[in-house]
């Protein structure tokens, strides 16, 4: 399940499919459909919408449908990690672990929260580190949303420059986000060869 930030994953793989073609093509349905590679927008909501816990039961209801053939489940945050407490994240991790134990044939993908510009001392980073440590220690599968937004495609690191989810960052250390690493990278690389045009909610 996802809302707007999680939609970046779907629009991204859809654009890769259009840009590169086979073997990156895939089948898609908006809702549940057996035999389809990606069932999008089902279950509805995200990890904090309408609350921080009901997504787990919606996952059970989804997987318990007759004929269900899903072997991967991935839930996305929107902005809820930014104001999450340690207890909130413990709840998330515990619910994920319970689902893994109940459905051993399904791979559950954990996720960090997207960047919010608060830097390495902000609550978001602390909570993301909590998720990362749990996944590392437990051998979990993690889609590290924040980490992806922290590096450009050449591996240049922006995490210490207060980057946000739009790829804006503080270029000169004055506390103002005055540059955008995604636009800079695109402008120095060739469209259609190094990168492709793709809509991305909230981002470049």
Annotate each PLM feature:
Residues 51-59, 85-97, 122-131:
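Well-ordered, non-membrane alpha-helical segments in soluble/globular domains
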Residues 165-204:
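Histidine-centered active-site loop/cap adjacent to the catalytic His
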Residues 1, 6, 24-31, 37-43, ...:
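Structural recognition of the beta-strand scaffold that forms the well-ordered cores
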Residues 5, 9-12, 73, 88-95, ...:
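Stable alpha-helical elements in mature extracytoplasmic
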Residues 34-57, 157-163:
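Charged, often glycine-rich, active-site loop that binds/positions anionic groups
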Residues 113-154:
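Substrate-gating cap/lid alpha-helix
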Residues 52-89, 116:
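Oxyanion-hole/transition-state-stabilizing segment in secreted/luminal serine hydrolases
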Residues 18, 65-69, 101-103, 135-137:
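Extracellular/periplasmic catalytic domains that process cell-envelope and extracellular macromolecules
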């Amino acid at each position: 399940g996802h809302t707007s930030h999680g939609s970046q994953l779907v629009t991204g793989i859809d654009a890769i499919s259009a840009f590169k073609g086979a073997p990156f093509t895939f089948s898609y349905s908006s809702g549940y459909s057996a035999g389809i590679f990606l069932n999008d927008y089902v279950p509805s909501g995200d990890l904090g919408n309408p609350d921080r816990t009901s997504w787990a039961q919606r996952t059970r209801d989804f997987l318990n449908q007759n004929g269900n053939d899903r072997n991967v489940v991935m839930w996305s945050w929107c902005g809820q990690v930014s104001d999450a407490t340690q207890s909130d994240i413990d709840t998330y991790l515990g619910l994920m672990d319970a689902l893994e134990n109940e459905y051993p044939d399904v791979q559950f993908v954990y996720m960090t929260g997207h960047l919010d510009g608060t830097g390495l001392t902000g609550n978001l980073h602390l909570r993301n580190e909590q998720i990362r440590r749990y996944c590392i220690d437990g051998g979990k599968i993690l889609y590290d949303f924040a980490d992806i937004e922290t590096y450009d495609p050449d591996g240049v690191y922006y995490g210490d420059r207060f980057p946000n989810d739009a790829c804006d960052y503080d270029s000169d250390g004055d506390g103002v986000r005055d540059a955008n690493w995604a636009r800079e990278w695109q402008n120095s690389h060739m469209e259609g060869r190094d990168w492709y045009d793709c809509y991305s909610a909230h981002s470049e």
